[in-house]
Amino acid sequence: MGVTVVSHPLVKHKLTIMRKKETSTASFRRLLKEISLLLCYEVTRNLELTTMSIETPLMPMEAPVLEGKKLVFASILRAGNGLLEGMLDLVPAARVAHIGLYRDHDTLQPIEYYFKAPEDIVNRLVIVVDPMLATANSAIAAIDKLKERGATNIRFLCLLAAPEGIERFTKAHPDVEVFTASIDECLDEKGYIVPGLGDAGDRMYGTK
């Protein structure tokens, strides 16, 4: 399906401020909400529409509305939750799934500790969210789990992606399109995206 880099000037500007090491936790969290709304606009751009009959104050008309079942936003915990607020502001009727994964700092492999998703996920568009696509191990594991539950229409949304992560992800899930605000240079020896923005979860919640 490929990779879409969202190159809107507001996205670029806000991402630059998020990258700055002196940006406060409060500002980082606010910017993450703002940029997630802009990214959500792009990832939902080609949703299918149908029409319904309505009446305006002046006359009846056939008007466009979204077709099919509501979206599912699937957050990879914990940092993925930072993207949810802005996305739910844009699509308040969306269902939400939570996938609890953390990365073993020695092996860089994901360890699952929680999974909760709507039961009728089979016929829904699922947008998986995580700020960083670094090694891609967590993203691959999350989508593996969603596919086990029957999801077939999946997209992945992140702030930053590493070329190594994109390569691994697209090999594992060639049917899942990736949307990102930036493709950075590479991964360092610890598996962090560089130049990156640090640990998104720590910066969002003020932890280390």
Curated annotation (Swiss-Prot):
The keyword Mitochondrion does not apply. Allosterically activated by GTP. Belongs to the UPRTase family. It comes from the Bacteria. The keyword Glycosyltransferase applies. Gene3D superfamilies: 3.40.50.2020. Catalyzes the conversion of uracil and 5-phospho-alpha-D-ribose 1-diphosphate (PRPP) to UMP and diphosphate. Its cofactor is Mg(2+). GO terms for biological process: UMP salvage; uracil salvage. Uracil binds at residues 193, 198-200. Its EC number is 2.4.2.9. HAMAP family: Upp_B (MF_01218_B). It is an enzyme of class 2 (transferase). Pathway: Pyrimidine metabolism; UMP biosynthesis via salvage pathway; UMP from uracil: step 1/1. GO terms for molecular function: GTP binding; magnesium ion binding; uracil phosphoribosyltransferase activity. It catalyses: UMP + diphosphate = 5-phospho-alpha-D-ribose 1-diphosphate + uracil. This is Uracil phosphoribosyltransferase.
